[in-house]
């Protein structure tokens, strides 16, 4: 076992305690089909990974993809929802299950940039043609007909106003972790953190008995200046509103609020 196991194990225990306290107030139910669609199965190694967008999924999927079967499901391996109900339930009970989380403000900015600053499919990207049009229509004052038609050029304040008012539950790229992975309905063996990804990934591979594989080199991005640049564009009250929208993501996973935005809230300007 690795030399950091004691420290990592302690943090894991503390986090599981917070999860128990939070989920203890909720009635347990069967995971819905949307959640099961986020759980990727690597049957040979009895591992299930909940993919959370913008939390190192591009590092985990290629690694775990080495283990997919040749059953023709998808390039990333089958998802739990694709199995018969009885088998899916058994896998959820017996397989090693893990997910990763990220500081909520960082993840939200990463999602915005990925979908609206550098859209992969350009102006044909559905995040532009569907969500972009909606955001501009509802949250831009006096939008041009061109902007309404294209959905291109969503500004960060517009995106945040959309999230606060209606958008947090509309897409998993910016949904709460509870809605993506259903951690109150599924008992995860481990929840790792983007900020300590290399160490946490090694811990997961050890616990899942996959020590013959090595997690790819990774350096978590810490762009505090960029974060402050974007969030300084919105009113302080909106930052507080985001804290309420993502309250469970902050509280359960040990991220302080307002965390990296503390200087913005405390400033008098």
Task: Name each model-derived stretch.
Residues 1-269:
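Membrane-interface amphipathic segments in extracytoplasmic regions
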């Amino acid at each position: 076992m690795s030399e950091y196991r004691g420290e990592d194990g302690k943090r894991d225990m503390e986090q599981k305690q917070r999860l128990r306290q939070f989920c203890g107030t909720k009635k347990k139910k069967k995971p819905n089909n949307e959640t099961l669609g986020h759980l990727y199965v690597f049957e040979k190694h009895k591992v299930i990974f909940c993919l959370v967008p913008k939390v190192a999924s591009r590092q985990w999927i290629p690694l775990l993809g080495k283990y997919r079967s040749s059953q023709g499901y998808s390039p990333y391996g089958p998802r739990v929802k694709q199995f018969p109900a009885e088998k899916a339930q058994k896998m959820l009970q017996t397989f090693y299950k893990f997910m990763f989380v990220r500081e909520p403000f960082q993840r939200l900015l990463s999602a915005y940039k990925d979908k609206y600053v550098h859209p992969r499919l350009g102006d044909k990207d559905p995040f532009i043609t569907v969500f972009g049009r909606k955001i501009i229509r509802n949250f831009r004052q006096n939008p041009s007909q061109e902007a309404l038609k294209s959905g291109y050029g969503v500004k960060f304040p517009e995106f945040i106003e959309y999230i606060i008012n209606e958008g947090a539950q509309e897409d998993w790229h910016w949904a709460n972790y509870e809605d993506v992975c259903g951690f109150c309905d599924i008992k995860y063996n481990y929840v790792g953190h983007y900020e300590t990804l290399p160490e946490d990934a090694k811990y997961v591979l050890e616990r899942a008995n996959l020590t013959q594989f090595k997690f790819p080199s990774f350096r978590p991005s810490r762009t505090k200046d960029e974060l402050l640049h974007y969030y300084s564009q919105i009113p302080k009250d909106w930052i507080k509103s985001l804290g309420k929208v993502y309250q469970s993501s902050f509280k359960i996973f040990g991220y302080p609020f307002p965390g990296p935005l503390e200087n913005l809230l405390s400033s008098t300007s």
